[in-house]
Amino acid sequence: MESKSGRFPFPFQPYPIQESFMEALYTALDQRKVGIFESPTGTGKSLSLICGALTWLRDYEEQRKQEAARLLEGQKDSDVVKEKNSNSGPPEPDWVSEFVQKKAERDMVNKLKDEELKRKKREERLEMIRHNAQLRYAMKRKADEDDEAVKLLQLSREGAEPETHSPEEEGLIVAEYESDDEATPKSRLCDDDNDDDDDLEEEHVTKIYYCSRTHSQLAQFVHEVQKSPYGDAVRLVNLGSRQNLCINPEVVRLGNVQMMNERCLEMQKNKHEKRQKASDSESKRSRGLAKATCVFSRFENLMAMKDEVLVKVRDVEQLIQHGRETHTCPYYSTRMSIPAAQVVVLPYQSLLHASTRKASGIKLKDQIVIIDEAHNLMDTISAIHSAEISGGQLCRAHSQLSQYCERYRSRLKAKNLMYIKQILFVLEGLVRTLGGKVGQNPNTQSCQTGSELLTINDFLFKAQVDNINLFKVQKYFEKSMISRKLCGFAEKYEGSGINTHSSSKNKENRRTEGLGRFLQTLQSKPTDVSEQQMAVEDKPIMASPMMLAESFLFALTNANKDGRVVIQRQACVAQSSLKFLLLNAAVHFAQILQECRAVIIAGGTMQPVADFKEQLLFSAGVTEERILEFSCGHVIPPENILPIVLCAGPSGQQLEFTFQTRDSPQMMEETGRVLSNLCNIVPGGVVCFFPSYEYEKRILGHWESTGILQRLQSKKKIFQEPKKASQVEQVLSEYSKCIQRCSNIGGGQTGALLFSVVGGKMSEGINFSDDLGRCIVMVGMPYPNIKSPELQEKMAYLDKHMPHVAGKSPGKALVESLCMKAVNQSIGRAIRHRGDYACIVLCDHRYARTGTLQKLPEWIRSSTHTHATFGPAFASARRFFLEKRQKATL
C-alpha cells in the first residue's frame, strides 16, 4: 500500500501526520538539512523514518543512474565530434583550460563506468546468493565440515605440551616505535594476498546510518524494517559490539567488553603473524603450541558472509545464528559489509565517538545520519567523551606498567622506554592529586575528603605533568597498543607467583611473581554481601586498568575551555577518583554535521529545542537556514487525553514542592490525599512519579506512619520501581497481571499503583499503554541538584559562552530544560495508540507558568487545563473516566 500522495510505500494507509512526517523528512534529506523531528510515542515514528528515508534513497539512486547514463551517452557523442574536428585548424588560445575541462570530464566518465561495473557485479553476486539455494546448502555443508575439523583440532591440543616461555612472551613486548611514523598498519583481517581485489577496494555507496540508545531499540527498528515494504530489497547491516556479536567461546566467556576486545584483537594479531611466518615454518620446525587464533575469522568465510549479510535483513540474534551455522564471525563480517550497505544500524557509541567510528570502518562523507531517541543527545555526547578513573585503578596501572618495564627493559627500544617512563610519570602525578603515592597500597592510604573542580590546564599544573606532551603520549598509546600488551601481561601473571620453564629466567621471575599478589591487595574487598553483589553487577574488574588511564589521558587533550576535571577525595586513595567532564558537546558533534549530507535528530519529545539548537547546532557552525524543524501532534483524538495542572490539594493547601516546603508534613499529607482521591476514580493502573529516590523514600515513610499508604492499598495494589535493572521486568509483569486480574474479577481493588522516580528505570523506554497507565501523576518538578559541582560548572560555561535569551541566563535555562525534558519523558509514555486514553496530573502550581507550559509537547500543551483548586480538577477527571466507561459499554 502507498500513501495518499502515492509517493511513499507503506504497509498500511498512513495517518496524515505520518505523511507529513515523511514529506518533511524527504525534503530534509534532499536539501541537505539538519532536521529536528518530534513525533510522540505511539505515532509510528520508526516506520515513518524507514519509509520516508528509504524512498528518498531509492529516488536518489535512480537519479544517479540516469545521470550516469546521460554522461556516458554524452561521452560517446563527444568522441564523434572530436573525430570530426581532429583535422581542423590550430587550437584556440584557451586550449589549456579546454584540455583541463576535457580531462576532468574523462575522469568523471571513467569513475562512473567503474562505479557502474562494481554496482552490477555486486547486484549479480547478491542476486545469485539470494536465489541459489544449492549454493547456500553447499556453504552450510562446508561449514559443518569445518566444525568437525575445529573439534578435532581442539581435541588434539588438549594433550599437547604447554608452549615454551620465550615465544609466548614475544607477543607481550611492544614493537619498535618511531613517533613520527604516520604509516597506517595493514588490516589484520586480510588473509588474501590479492591486494587489488575489487571487493577490498569497494567504495561506500550513499547510505543511511541509523543509531539509537539501546540494543533493544535497534532490534525493534530492524523488525520494523523487516515488516516494511522495503524489507525484502534493502541491504541492511546491523552493527554491534563484540559483546553482542562474538561467537568465539574463548572470547565470550570473558564477559567484560573491554577484555573481549583485547582478546579478539590479540587473536587477529596472532593470525596475521602466523601468515607472515608461514614460509619460515617450512624450513624451521616450530616448538610448542601455536598462539591462539580465531577459527571464525577465515578470510574466505568472512567474504562469503559479508554478502550473505546484505541479502537478507537480520537482527543481532539472527546474525549470531547465521554465524554459528557458517562458522563465521558476525562482528567482522558485518563491518566488511558496510561499504555496500544501504542502511547501517548501530548504537550511539559507534557513531558519536570518532575513534570507534574509525575503527568500525564508518565513513560519513556525504552520507545520511538519523539519530533516534535523541532527547538526551547532548548529555549522551558528553557522557561518551567524559572519563573517570579511581585511585585504585591508577595505582594498579602504575604497578603493572612498572613491572612490565622492569621485566622487559633489556628488550625494549629507547623510544619505548622513554614513552613508558613518561606514562609512569603522568600516572604518578595523577595519584598525587588524590593525596596518594604510587607503590603503596591505596586501600590503606588515607586522604582528606572533599571535592575540587579545575580547568584542564590547572589540573595538569597541579599534577605537575604540564611539561608532558599528551598528544604524543596519546599517539604512542594508539600505535604501540601498550594497553593491550599490558592486559596480556597482567592476565599471564595475575594470581599466585609464577615459575617459568627456563631456569635461566629466575631473576626475571622474581621481579614479577609478586605482581598478582600485589594487584589483589589493591582491589577493595567489601565485606557486606549486598555490597559485593552490587560491585559485581555495576563495576566489573578489568584486566588492564591502563585502558581506563588511556581514556582519561585522551580526554585531557580537549581544549582547556571545553572541559573540567573533578577531583573527588574519599576516605582512602583507592576510593577517590578523577573525572573529566565535557562541557562543550558541539566540539565532538561538529565533524558529523560537517561531513554528512544530512543529519536527522528525532525523538518522541524533543521539547524544549531552543537550547538544543544553541548549544549543539549553532555552536558547531550550523546556520539557521540549514535547520528544518518538524513537530506533529498525536494520532489520538483530543478528547482521549486530559492533562491537568493542579495548583492545590483537597484541603486548599497550595502544591509547591520546593526544597524548603516539600518535606513539610502538611505537603506530604496533601499529596497523599490527592493521590487517594484519584485512585478512587481511575480504573486500571496509576503511575506516580517522584522527583528523586530520596524523596520517594521520605514521603512513603510518612504515608506509612500516618495510614495514607493503607488507604491507597485498599483501592490499588502498590508496586514500587526497583533500583536494579534486572528486576524491572518482574515488577512490570506483576503490575500488569494485577491490573488484568482486577479488571476481570472486580472486587475492592480496582487496579494497581506504581511508584516510580523521574529518570529512573520506569520513566524512559517503558510504555504504559491502555490499562497500565490510565493516570500519570507527576509530584513536583524534578529539577537537578543545583549544588552539584558538575552542573554549576556547566551553567557557568553556558553563561560565559552562550547568548542570553529573553533576559534569562543560559545556565538557568539549562536547569529548566533538564527538568522539563525529564517530565516530558515520564508523561509521554502514557499514550501508545489511537484508541488509548489517559489523564496526566501535574502536581505543582509552578507548572501553570507560561514559560513552563511552553516546554510541554504541543499535543499535551494544547489540551492542558490549569485548576487553582482541587474540586474542579477532580470533577473533570471523574467526568473524563465516566465518559470513557460509558463509551466502552456502547
Curated annotation (Swiss-Prot):
Its EC number is 5.6.2.3. Residues 71-95, 176-199 are annotated as: Disordered. Residues 71-85 have a biased composition (Basic and acidic residues). GO terms for cellular component: centrosome; cytoplasm; midbody; nucleolus; nucleus; spindle pole. It is found in: Nucleus; Nucleus, Nucleolus; Cytoplasm, Cytoskeleton, Spindle pole; Midbody. Binds 1 [4Fe-4S] cluster. ATP binds at residues 39-46. SMART domains: DEXDc2 (SM00488), HELICc2 (SM00491). Residues 4-424 form the Helicase ATP-binding domain. Pfam families: DEAD_2, Helicase_C_2. One of its GO terms (biological process) is nucleolar chromatin organization. Its main location: nucleus. One of its GO terms (molecular function) is ATP binding. Keywords: 4Fe-4S, Activator, ATP-binding, Cytoplasm, Cytoskeleton, Developmental protein, DNA damage, DNA repair, DNA replication, DNA-binding, Helicase, Hydrolase, Iron, Iron-sulfur, Isomerase, Metal-binding, Nucleotide-binding, Nucleus, RNA-binding, Transcription, Transcription regulation. It catalyses: Couples ATP hydrolysis with the unwinding of duplex DNA at the replication fork by translocating in the 5'-3' direction. This creates two antiparallel DNA single strands (ssDNA). The leading ssDNA polymer is the template for DNA polymerase III holoenzyme which synthesizes a continuous strand; ATP + H2O = ADP + phosphate + H(+). Disruption phenotype: Morpholino knockdown of the protein leads to abnormal craniofacial and vertebrate development with shortened and twisted torsos, smaller eyes and low mouth positions at 3 days post-fertilization (dpf). Its cofactor is [4Fe-4S] cluster. [4Fe-4S] cluster binds at residues 246, 264, 294, 329. A motif (DEAH box) lies at residues 372-375. Belongs to the DEAD box helicase family. DEAH subfamily. DDX11/CHL1 sub-subfamily. DNA-dependent ATPase and ATP-dependent DNA helicase that participates in various functions in genomic stability, including DNA replication, DNA repair and heterochromatin organization as well as in ribosomal RNA synthesis. Plays a role in DNA double-strand break (DSB) repair at the DNA replication fork during DNA replication recovery from DNA damage. Plays a role in the regulation of sister chromatid cohesion and mitotic chromosome segregation. Stimulates 5'-single-stranded DNA flap endonuclease activity of FEN1 in an ATP- and helicase-independent manner. This is ATP-dependent DNA helicase DDX11. It comes from Danio rerio. The gene is ddx11.
